[in-house]
Amino acid sequence: DCPSDWSSHEEHCYKVFRLFKTWEEAEKFCTQQVNGWHLASIESVEEANFLAELVPKTLIKSKYHVWIGLRDQSERQQCSSHWTDGSAVSYEKVVRFTKCFGLNKDKGYLEWVTLPCEDKNPFICKSWVPH
């Protein structure tokens, strides 16, 4: 089972943090929680819909986008092929590519938005359900 204040979906645990961190600070924060946590990867439309429902429960009437575990690490303006937790990008919902990715507050957290990695936003950590 997931820790008591985390939410579960499929075989993963999630938590939205109301802390304002840059993308790198947020990823570091997730990895320091428990071994194996990262900024959330989104690997299906079902997972995207789950997170779109989860975020507003924590960030009530939020004016902020929410970091997810994807960023462009190349010189060319192309998306990285892997999430920070190492899983392959098999599902994409994005309009244009630049640097770091978040869930778009103006689209009900269903669409991705590219943001400067130095912006400070809330974020979602994700890991496998502990066995």
Swiss-Prot record:
Keyword Secreted appears in the UniProt entry: yes
Tissue: Expressed by the venom gland.
Keyword flag Ion transport: no
Keywords: Disulfide bond, Hemostasis impairing toxin, Secreted, Toxin
MF-aspect GO terms: toxin activity
SMART domains xrefs: CLECT
SUPFAM superfamilies, per the entry: C-type lectin-like
InterPro entries with a match to the protein in the record: C-type_lectin-like, C-type_lectin-like/link_sf, C-type_lectin/snaclec_domain, CTDL_fold
Protein name (Swiss-Prot/TrEMBL): Snaclec macrovipecetin subunit alpha
UniProt organism field: Macrovipera lebetinus (Levantine viper)
High-level lineage: Eukaryota, Metazoa, Chordata, Craniata, Vertebrata
